[in-house]
């Protein structure tokens, strides 16, 4: 009896360690030698993947938006996004503050009050950037952590290879094919805002 109990406890501990190890591996690494000055400027939000219920409900009506990244005095960013909402252009600005090594930032969600960590996982600065956003769960979200992968591109029509790179990245973060969306282009709200 003691031997089977010990074996059972050993399997449980291995399972727990396996889960912890899997969660740790799920956090993507940062862009090596991230160069903030090259990341500045205009980007198009071309692809998204998320586990949030809001995203699942709205993903069919989302369209591409523009985001302008500008530096702040503390080494962070002002991220100003302009998007189409209910047939009107809406602009929102988030203050991304440094939150660790270069390429890691955080902001507080104006809607939920949660702190989100944003990581620039990969970028070539001239064509695309892959970002990963994570926020610890709160009771208001049903106990589920918020996760999102984002594809930024410098042009409205990213190359198929860039889209494939984003799909592979999103799947590596645990998103399923149906959670990955490439946002359709629109001619509305695409003018440059600073």
From Swiss-Prot:
Pfam families xref list: Lipocalin (PF00061)
Annotated disulfide bonds: 89-189
Gene Ontology biological-process annotations: gene expression; mast cell degranulation; negative regulation of male germ cell proliferation; prostaglandin biosynthetic process; regulation of circadian sleep/wake cycle, sleep
EC supergroup of this enzyme: isomerase
Keywords: Cytoplasm, Disulfide bond, Endoplasmic reticulum, Fatty acid biosynthesis, Fatty acid metabolism, Glycoprotein, Golgi apparatus, Isomerase, Lipid biosynthesis, Lipid metabolism, Mast cell degranulation, Membrane, Nucleus, Prostaglandin biosynthesis, Prostaglandin metabolism, Pyrrolidone carboxylic acid, Secreted, Signal, Transport
EC number(s) recorded for this UniProt protein: 5.3.99.2
Subcellular location: Rough endoplasmic reticulum; Nucleus membrane; Golgi apparatus; Cytoplasm, Perinuclear region
Organs and tissues of expression: In the male reproductive system, it is expressed in the testis and epididymis, and is secreted into the seminal fluid.
Role, per record: Catalyzes the conversion of PGH2 to PGD2, a prostaglandin involved in smooth muscle contraction/relaxation and a potent inhibitor of platelet aggregation. Involved in a variety of CNS functions, such as sedation, NREM sleep and PGE2-induced allodynia, and may have an anti-apoptotic role in oligodendrocytes. Binds small non-substrate lipophilic molecules, including biliverdin, bilirubin, retinal, retinoic acid and thyroid hormone, and may act as a scavenger for harmful hydrophobic molecules and as a secretory retinoid and thyroid hormone transporter.
Domain remark text: Forms a beta-barrel structure that accommodates hydrophobic ligands in its interior.
Name the record gives this protein: Prostaglandin-H2 D-isomerase
């Amino acid at each position: 009896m003691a031997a089977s109990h010990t074996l059972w406890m050993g399997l449980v501990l291995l399972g727990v360690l396996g889960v912890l190890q899997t969660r740790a591996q799920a956090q993507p690494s940062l862009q090596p030698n991230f160069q903030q000055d090259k990341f500045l400027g205009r980007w198009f939000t071309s692809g998204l993947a998320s586990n949030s219920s809001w995203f699942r409900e709205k993903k069919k009506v989302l369209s591409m938006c523009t985001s302008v990244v500008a530096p702040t005095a503390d080494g962070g960013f002002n991220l100003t996004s302009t998007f189409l909402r209910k047939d009107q252009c809406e602009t929102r600005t988030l203050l991304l503050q440094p939150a660790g090594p270069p390429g890691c930032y955080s902001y507080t969600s104006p809607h939920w009050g949660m702190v989100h960590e944003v990581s620039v996982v990969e970028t070539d600065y001239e064509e695309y950037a892959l970002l990963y956003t994570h926020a610890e769960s709160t009771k208001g979200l049903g106990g589920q952590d918020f996760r999102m992968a984002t594809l930024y591109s410098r042009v409205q029509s990213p190359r198929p290879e860039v889209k494939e790179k984003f799909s592979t990245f999103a799947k590596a973060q645990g998103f399923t094919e149906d959670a990955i969306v490439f946002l359709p282009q629109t001619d509305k709200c695409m003018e440059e805002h600073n």
